[in-house]
């Protein structure tokens, strides 16, 4: 027991001296420091040997829970760091960098394999001379371990991006994501009633690094009029698959049903396996491209994006221009867009996803490989086994070669191309694809063999001097006998050659900003021609202007025009708007002109502090009076969009969209609002405290009754932050840790814990049965093992988050030593005074506490408190940072502020 006594005495001494050293100019020198032990207010000071503390950089051996800062960059989590006694220096101490810590430093793999390890007891520690120039320094005042590591030893890192060693695969769990749209429409002329319900989403499970997924979609359509009633419904599982990250290869492995991912070949559905270089694993500056869809909705509308007949994306949009930018980049080829207006009209157009091929960095290779059987949407195979492979090689700086091959028994294609960065001229890529297709007689063909070529050129340039960008993405000319794999599979499925296969396809986009004038312009044009069917084209032009008019500030005006040509039908339209601020809201004029149809509207729009948005419009069109409204709410449980339309003498309609999900894990679960189906998310835990506001990069959400919340707006392979809004905490709740960070792999369910306590604040005095007190620095914890405070001198402790009737335990020497019970109820008088709490020694513990010690005078280890009329009052916080205290059994704890 006497040994423990001295440890309890030395802990505050060590920390106090350590802080003095860290603040002293002598700490950086090689000189020893002499101390006057008279300043120590502890018993038996003559028996305290502090000679070792006079040595430069000495830290009392033990385990400290510290933040790790590498070359100024802080790691997401705290780590237990052990200080050990070197064999060559019994009076010294040094950091034991264990393998778990070293793997987080981001050392290059070829260097990590050569590291030398030494043994300290049961611990493996990095030899101090393993890497020349590596240095560890402790900043106990800020609970931080500073690691200096030459940049040449480290993998590439970015401000918001971590190397693979720091990626987190998350925890096991089950997810269910959904996107449901419901529309009701009453036709006033015919009296018919229509209801349309559609939905899609993902069901999945996470096991280690594996993500198991099943995509679903369903629809229900009901029509009721005077003549008949019809109901159509459909439900299907469109895709079963599993995937995981391969960090060492910088790639993604996918098993099951998937879409061919390719930069040179068109996509199709198949079942099999693929290994693909994943751009998401690259730093943000080096990542790839995802398609963007722009258009104009003439009324509140539902926008569907489909590929080869399957819905990939579905959402509700208000009347006016819309832009969809959160599509998955895994699908290549042509996307079909359907805009279903609430007035019953429909727009349709195609969007090509072509982009300028990625210019690979010098000496690097990016690749994509797949093996499997093509199949239809009913999961039936179409042909035999196929294989595909493609790669891009960075030959020199700014010049890349790329190509690939794909084939099965009756179809083969090969592609070869080159990309070149031309400096101020821009970037260009050119490639050619040759195909051979054998059409066997038993499939209804005459046994002919079709051969042809397809040529493609892509160009992109940033005009920095005029703040603009031009992209000529994918002019492609295909000979009549050229067949893509997708064309070949269609021929096999429908037993005839598609007479309308593609001849030309190109997409042009241009962005221009006029920052001084507050103006911007956007233009996109895509066109497809076919050998034996009508051409298709689509263009969008958008002009925006932000300006002031006299004393009226922040006005905005926009002009949007579009034209689409699809299956021989043309659709043209113009949308103009003017918006004027009105307090925190705005009033507006909107005009929509489409052929013989026109609509003029006055509108009022606004938003609330919780992120809700609404729009109200009244106006006139060729039918008569018209009104519509739109409301969007980002709730903690789901995203909700509501819309309503009315047109005099024509129709009235209602629309609703719900997007959200459910996540269940071994650490708990929650309902939550939506993101990309099946994607990455973060489960946060606030120790059972409900209604705690937490947020990621988007709108805040709140924890449920179990103290859990899921943040859905979390990226993959990039550092994500989650934080508690301390200004909106529930009454009597306090957060001692309000910010966490994590870097998750794709599809992971991350988990982070916030230190939150809820309850009363009070001053207490802990007294043992023999009249003594728990030692200085002892921890007070509740039944959930949450730290509520620290014991100061004479058993005094300022506690936060206590609840009536609970049992508190006091810890020292690394274990719970005694416990005290709180009264069943708290009265104002009781909370206003110091409460004496008898602390009963736990079974197996000695009947008496270690000899008490007094704190260091004027030391910063604990917040000061004052007394009035002999009664303690709430402590007054000092501004000095508190270092962690090593415990005797090599467990560490951070000293928390007492209020």
Where do the protein language model's features map onto the residues?
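Short Pro-Gly-centered beta-turn/loop motif in secreted/extracellular proteins
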Residues: 88-97, 327-332, 708-734, 746, ...
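Short, acidic Ser/Thr/Gly-rich low-complexity loop/linker segments typical of extracellular
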Residues: 699-708, 785-796
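Transmembrane beta-barrel strands of outer-membrane/channel proteins
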Residues: 178-182, 214-218, 253-259, 369-373, ...
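A short, amphipathic beta-strand motif
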Residues: 68, 293-295, 682-686, 760-770
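Extracellular beta-sheet/turn segments enriched in Thr/Pro/Gly and aliphatic residues
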Residues: 144-148, 357-361, 674, 738-759, ...
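Feature captures outer-membrane beta-barrel proteins of Gram-negative bacteria and organelles
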Residues: 167, 197-208, 231-247, 383-405, ...
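Post-signal-peptide, soluble extracytosolic/periplasmic N-terminal scaffold domains
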Residues: 5, 26-287, 596-663, 673, ...
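Short, ordered, surface-exposed loop/turn motifs in non-cytosolic proteins
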Residues: 60-69, 73-83, 301, 688-698, ...
């Amino acid at each position: 027991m006497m040994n423990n006594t001295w440890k309890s005495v030395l802990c505050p001494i060590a920390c106090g001296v350590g802080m003095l050293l860290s603040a002293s100019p002598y700490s950086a020198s090689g000189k020893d420091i002499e101390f006057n032990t008279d300043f120590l207010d502890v018993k038996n000071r003559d028996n305290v040997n502090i000679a070792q503390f006079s040595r430069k950089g000495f830290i009392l051996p033990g385990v400290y829970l510290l933040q790790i800062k590498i070359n100024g960059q802080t790691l997401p989590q705290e780590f237990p760091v052990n200080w050990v006694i070197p064999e060559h220096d019994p009076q010294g101490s040094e950091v034991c960098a264990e393998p778990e810590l070293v793997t987080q430093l981001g050392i290059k793999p070829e260097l990590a394999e050569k590291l030398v390890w030494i043994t300290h007891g049961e611990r493996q520690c990095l030899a101090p001379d393993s890497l020349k120039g590596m240095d560890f320094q402790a900043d106990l005042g800020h609970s931080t371990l500073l690691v200096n590591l030459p940049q040449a030893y480290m993998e590439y890192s970015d401000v918001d991006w971590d190397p693979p060693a720091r990626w987190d695969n998350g925890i096991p769990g089950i997810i269910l994501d959904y996107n449901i749209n419901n529309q009701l429409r009453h036709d006033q002329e015919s009296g018919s009633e229509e209801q349309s319900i559609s939905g899609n989403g993902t069901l999945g499970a996470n096991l280690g690094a594996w993500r198991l997924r099943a995509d679903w979609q369903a629809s229900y359509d009901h029509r009721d009029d005077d003549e008949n009633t019809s109901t159509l419904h459909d439900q299907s599982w469109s895709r079963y698959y599993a995937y995981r990250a391969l960090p060492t290869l910088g790639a993604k492995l996918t098993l099951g049903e998937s879409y061919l991912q390719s930069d040179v070949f068109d996509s199709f559905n198949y079942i099999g396996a693929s290994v693909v270089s994943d751009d998401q694993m690259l730093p943000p500056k080096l990542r790839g491209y995802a398609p963007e869809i722009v258009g104009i909705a003439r009324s509140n509308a539902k926008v569907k994006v489909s590929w080869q007949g399957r819905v990939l994306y579905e959402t509700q949009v208000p009347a006016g221009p819309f832009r969809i930018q959160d599509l998955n980049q895994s699908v290549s080829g042509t996307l079909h867009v359907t805009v279903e207006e609430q007035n019953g009209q429909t727009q349709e157009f195609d969007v090509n996803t072509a982009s300028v091929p990625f210019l690979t960095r010098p000496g690097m290779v990016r690749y994509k490989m797949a093996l499997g059987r093509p199949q239809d949407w009913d999961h039936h195979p179409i042909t035999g086994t196929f294989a595909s492979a493609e790669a891009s090689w960075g030959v020199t700086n700014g010049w890349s070669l790329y190509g690939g091959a794909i084939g099965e028994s009756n179809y083969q294609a090969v592609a070869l191309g080159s990309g070149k960065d031309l400096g101020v001229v821009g970037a260009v890529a050119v490639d050619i694809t040759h195909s051979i297709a054998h059409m066997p007689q038993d499939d209804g063909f005459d046994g002919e063999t079709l051969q042809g070529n397809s040529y493609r050129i892509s160009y992109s340039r940033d005009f920095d001097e005029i703040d603009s960008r031009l992209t000529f993405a994918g002019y492609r000319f295909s000979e009549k006998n050229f067949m893509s794999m997708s064309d070949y599979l269609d021929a096999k499925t429908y037993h005839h050659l598609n007479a309308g296969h593609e001849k030309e396809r190109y997409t042009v986009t241009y962005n221009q900003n006029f920052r001084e004038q507050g103006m911007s312009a956007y233009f996109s044009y895509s066109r497809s021609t076919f050998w034996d069917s009508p051409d298709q084209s689509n263009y969008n032009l958008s002009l925006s202007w932000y300006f002031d008019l006299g004393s009226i500030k922040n006005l905005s005006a926009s002009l949007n025009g579009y034209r689409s040509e699809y299956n021989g039908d043309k659709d043209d339209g113009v949308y103009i708007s003017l918006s004027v601020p009105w307090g925190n809201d705005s009033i507006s004029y909107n005009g929509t002109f489409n052929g013989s149809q026109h609509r003029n509207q006055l509108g009022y729009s606004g938003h609330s502090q919780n992120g809700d948005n609404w729009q109200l419009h009244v106006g006139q069109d060729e039918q008569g009076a018209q009104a519509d409204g739109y409301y969007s709410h980002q709730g903690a449980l789901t995203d909700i969009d509501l819309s309503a339309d009315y047109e005099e003498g024509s129709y009235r309609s209602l629309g609703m969209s719900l997007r959200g999900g459910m996540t269940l894990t071994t650490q708990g679960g929650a309902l939550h609002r939506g993101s990309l189906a099946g994607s990455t998310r973060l489960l946060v835990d606030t120790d059972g405290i409900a209604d705690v506001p937490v947020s990621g990069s988007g709108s805040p959400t709140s924890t449920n009754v179990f103290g859990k919340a899921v943040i859905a707006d979390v990226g993959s392979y990039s550092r994500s932050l989650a934080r508690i809004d301390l200004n909106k905490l529930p009454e009597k709740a306090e957060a001692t840790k309000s910010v966490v960070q994590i870097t998750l792999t794709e599809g992971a369910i991350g988990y982070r814990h916030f230190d939150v306590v809820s309850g009363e604040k009070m001053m207490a005095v802990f007294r043992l049965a023999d009249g003594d007190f728990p030692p200085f620095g002892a921890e007070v914890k509740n039944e959930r093992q949450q730290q509520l405070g620290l014991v100061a001198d004479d058993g005094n402790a300022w506690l936060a988050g206590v609840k009536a009737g609970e049992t508190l335990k006091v810890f020292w020497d690394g274990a719970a030593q005694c416990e005290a019970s709180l009264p069943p109820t708290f009265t104002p008088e009781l909370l206003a005074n110091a409460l004496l709490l008898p602390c009963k020694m736990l079974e197996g513990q000695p009947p008496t506490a270690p000899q008490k010690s007094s704190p260091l005078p004027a030391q910063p280890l604990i917040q000061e408190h004052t007394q009035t009329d002999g009664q303690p009052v709430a402590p007054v916080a000092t501004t000095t940072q508190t270092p962690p205290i090593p415990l005797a059994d090599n467990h560490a704890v951070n000293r928390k502020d007492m209020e």
